[in-house]
């Protein structure tokens, strides 16, 4: 009888390990708050994460829809076996005004007062910096991070690119807005890192909103021209066949993967 018992025990161990692996793979992004700043963010660790090695970090900026959990989940599902720690901060610079009443935020009145007094971009930038400090300390994230976002996320992403290129490993913008918000030519970064920073714009070939002559396409072109005029020499545009106006999470993560190999 011993042999069948050992077989049953072995089967139970295998099933338990398989279930644990499946649970980790399908685990939803977790909502957290930075330890030194009130900004909140969704965290998703990669499959096989361990604290004994360094991991690349992708900061996902949501569009003006402000469906932060949807964005976090979309990138987590697209990640597959790629080694990225995914961070989706609840930023406030990704679109127009009136965001205080958006139900996907979870900030207390005191936090909203802080946003108003410090300014939206200062809140977001200081917040992302605080998040990265936590991610480096608690989850072995790398010092620099990748950043990506669709449409109105461009306001935030371009703001980071033009003010803090030294913090980034690369940026991906999908049909991005750009109106010069949070960017002042007198104070924008002159860090040498900007010259080689990889900045890629993505447009779905079937995206009818992001075609020549449309406002958002013109904004994207203006941002690229502004970047090149201010010493950013690694700015590119790529079209993705078969895709429309969408996050292009898989394409973005594939691009970032190409930068770490």
Predicted features and spans:
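Conserved hydrolase catalytic core segment
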Residues: 159-169
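Bacterial N-terminal signal peptides that target proteins for export
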Residues: 1-9
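Soluble non-cytosolic domains of exported or imported proteins
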Residues: 55, 118-126, 151, 162, ...
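Alpha/beta-hydrolase fold nucleophile elbow
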Residues: 139-151
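The feature captures the conserved acid-bearing segment of alpha/beta-hydrolase catalytic domains
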Residues: 170-251
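Serine-hydrolase catalytic machinery in alpha/beta-hydrolase-like enzymes
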Residues: 37-42, 53-140
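Bacterial N-terminal signal peptides
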Residues: 9-19
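A domain-start/cap signature at the N-terminus of enzymes
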Residues: 21-57, 70, 84, 120, ...
């Amino acid at each position: 009888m011993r042999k069948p018992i050992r077989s049953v025990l072995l089967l139970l161990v295998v099933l338990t390990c398989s279930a644990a692996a499946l649970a980790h793979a399908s685990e939803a992004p977790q909502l957290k708050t930075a330890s030194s700043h009130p900004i909140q963010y969704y965290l998703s660790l990669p499959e096989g994460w361990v604290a004994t090695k360094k991991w690349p970090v992708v900061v996902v900026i949501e569009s003006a829809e402000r469906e932060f959990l949807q964005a976090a989940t979309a990138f987590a599902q697209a990640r597959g076996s790629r080694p990225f720690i995914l961070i989706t901060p609840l930023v406030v610079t990704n679109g127009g005004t009136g965001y205080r009443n958006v139900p996907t935020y979870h900030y207390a009145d005191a936090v909203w007062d802080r946003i108003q007094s410090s300014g939206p971009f200062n809140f977001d930038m200081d917040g992302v910096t605080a998040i990265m400090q936590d991610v480096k300390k608690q989850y072995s994230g790398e010092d620099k991070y990748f950043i990506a976002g669709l449409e109105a996320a461009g306001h935030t992403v371009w703001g980071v690119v033009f003010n803090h290129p030294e913090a980034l490993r690369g940026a991906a913008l999908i049909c991005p807005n750009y109106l010069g918000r949070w960017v002042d030519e007198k104070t924008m970064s002159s860090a040498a890192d900007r010259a080689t920073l990889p900045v890629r714009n993505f447009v779905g070939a079937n995206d009818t909103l992001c075609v020549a002559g449309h406002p958002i396409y013109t904004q994207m072109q203006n941002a690229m021209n502004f970047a090149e005029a201010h010493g950013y020499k690694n700015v590119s545009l790529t079209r993705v066949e078969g895709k429309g106006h969408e996050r292009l999470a898989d394409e973005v993560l594939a691009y970032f993967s190409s930068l770490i190999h």
